Amino acid sequence: MSRSILVFDSGVGGLSILAEMQKLLPQHHYHYLFDHARLPYGELAEQTLIKGCVALILPMIEQVQADIVVIACNSASTLVLPALRAALSIPVVGVVPAIKPAAQLSHTKHIGLLATPGTIKREYTHRLINQYASDCKVELFGSSELVMLAEQKCAGLPVSIDKLTLLLQPIVATHVDVLVLGCTHFPMLRDEITTVLGNDIILLDSGEAIARRVQQLLHSNVMHELEPNYIANAYYTGDISDGLMQLLKTKGFEQIKKLTANGQLIK
């Protein structure tokens, strides 16, 4: 049985989560909602972020008759989940940095977390570290510039390896053996990050784990064939470039629609 899944992010980083879900559960209908107007979320005030997310997500749930919501954004997940779960009767899944598997994989017990400044400073992140990586030295690296580099890449623009090298230099100096990509945008730059850091550092993200969690909550069997009436739509706020629009079209979205800041369709 096909279910309706709403995936939400500030930008196109959540496409990395969406891809993992479509790979594991291709029989479901996917609606990708991204708040491009307020990108990047890692720099927003907490109450601004919470109110903005809730105002967008609640009407979209009703419109697409969602059976489950996935907040495919680390910055939003650390703040918005309680408000959404209090308002909804359907499951809400958030993305958290892969601290636990990183601590388990590390041979040196010296790991890094690369995320937005907002995620880095949140109490939730530090609770994760204390709970699952208390036996590790954890280096924290916050960057909003990497979010914009990922957005630029998705829009068809080249990624400056020189600029990326400069941004990642603090990580190189620490000699961590596992690096958590704690923002859903960052897997978009996996190849470029590996070019800078080398193959000796393991890069971890949460995509596969989120897909498995959605499978559990929907009690879905893994399928390898699309349903005849398979649906994939995208919705966005703000203005997006021609390159980004082209990327969305290559992802198989049947409809790509613009919304107002409070989730209303712009005719």
Q: Where does each model-flagged region fall?
A:
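Non-catalytic structural scaffold of enzyme domains
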Residues: 1-267
